[in-house]
Amino acid sequence: KQYGSLYWIYPVKALGRSRLILMWPNTTDGAIPVTDPVNHYYQDSVLASEVWRKLGSMIVARMEEPLKEFVAGGKAYDDGEAYEKLGNEYDKDEKAWKEENPDADDEDEEEVNRRPYVIKYKNAVAELCRNGGYITGGSSRSFEGDFSEWLRLLVMESYENIKKDYLDNSKPRALKYEILIKYFKEYGWDIQAAGNKYRTEFNKYKASLPSED
């Protein structure tokens, strides 16, 4: 029912290479209540994403060494140096912008996303990911983070969407994709087929929800 201390609870926690602990009911931020236990995996994408990231870390812990071809397919990991530099620049730009716009409303998400310093930051992170072959900016920290994000993406997203959003605009990502697909097939797992199914089932679930209008 609960793992962690009074002040720091872990809704999903990997213990070493072989144990994965899930609080149930799960309290991961954004997770949904269980209404259909059989199909909950295909409905709660937030919880599923978190679980696959943890499983990715557990898989890496079992490897004797990182996948050399995969690592060589993108830029070298830098322990987050480049990503954190972008974050520091964002903080400076945000501070300067707010000094010029003291009455700005941070509660208006659409307006916040149109601010120049936000657009600049998002574009810079996107470029970091395209050039390095990463899925997220944080993936540039280490092989573990990079592999985990790729695993989560492949097992939960369709090839059509992955190609459009990640492969067509980045040769390093396209190369890493092919390497991982081959890697998992050597273990008898067509991971992209799993991702295609997840996207199909998740879309069915979303379509079944009442309209918000």
Residues covered by each model-derived region:
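Active-site-flanking segments in enzyme catalytic domains
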Residues: 2-213
